Amino acid sequence: MACKTCCSKIPCFRQKKTVLVTGAAGLTGNMVYKKLKERSDLFVARGLVRSEGSKKKIGGHDDVFIGDVMDPKSLAPAMKGIDALVILTSAVPKIKPGSGPNTGKRAEDVIDSSFQGPMPEFYFEEGQYPEQVDWIGQKNQIDAAKAAGVKHIVLVGSMGGCDPNHFLNSLGNGNILVWKRKSEQYLADSGVPYTIIRAGGLENKAGGRELLVGKNDELLPTEAGYISRADVAEACVQAVQFEEVTKFKAFDLGSKPEGTGTPTKDFKALFSLVTARF
């Protein structure tokens, strides 16, 4: 089919975007990686993981690179030639031994809106503290992407950054939201076109809810302060696809409770509601 805007009979093809997802072995990162691969008519997917074991865990495909976000040089091969970067690396608190029945498990596998009972104690593994992963590691990714000429960076953060006393900062004494906010500001000041998605409380449930955007943690104390990982992953993919309405924007992302509202289908319209740059 010829392009309607020219006289040529040569077919017009939409150029695929090459998109790298870091943290591709994580719960949300892997969802984004898989969604990109499923839409091979629009995207060429790449993933970045920390180890050979993590690569095998998600299929061991040639489009999965191994790199350490604390080692900027190791990021260059994965960044080469990409159009967009989706940052989904994050420090992961784990439950302290002897602190409840889920000893050793990651907080994200246990704690969500349905959690009941006394809150256990948490810790971060050596070398995996929020200052290292959510600040220095994300800064390294932003710098590497900028050096590689990346045209768009989507950074997934968290709601709660406006409150220094938010309970997430107390987990393992990591101040995780403080460091996340610092990397968000660094990205906003980097000069690289960006989209910052501050997700609400993450739930390990099916997606397809009605999504809501906000700012300054206004959704956090409401019933819209939670969102499924699947919906966050979908928002990341859509943010890359509709970059014309997501670049240089930052927003909170929540959802109506499960079983209520109308599932969001028009992401371009949703993103067009956002006016905040940070």
Residue ranges and their predicted role:
Residues 152, 156-173, 182-211, 218-221, ...:
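Conserved beta-loop-beta element that borders a ligand/cofactor-binding pocket
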Residues 228-250, 254-258, 262-278:
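Alpha-helical substrate-binding/gating segment
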Residues 19, 30, 47-148:
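NAD(P)H-binding glycine-rich loop region in Rossmannoid oxidoreductase-like domains
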Residues 41-43, 146-152, 181:
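A short helix->loop->beta-strand "cap" motif at the edges of active sites that frequently abuts
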Residues 1-15:
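N-terminal chloroplast transit peptides
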Residues 85, 187, 197, 232-236, ...:
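Non-catalytic, hydrophobic alpha-helical segments
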Residues 13-42:
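N-terminal Rossmann NAD(P)H-binding glycine-rich loop of SDR-like oxidoreductase domains
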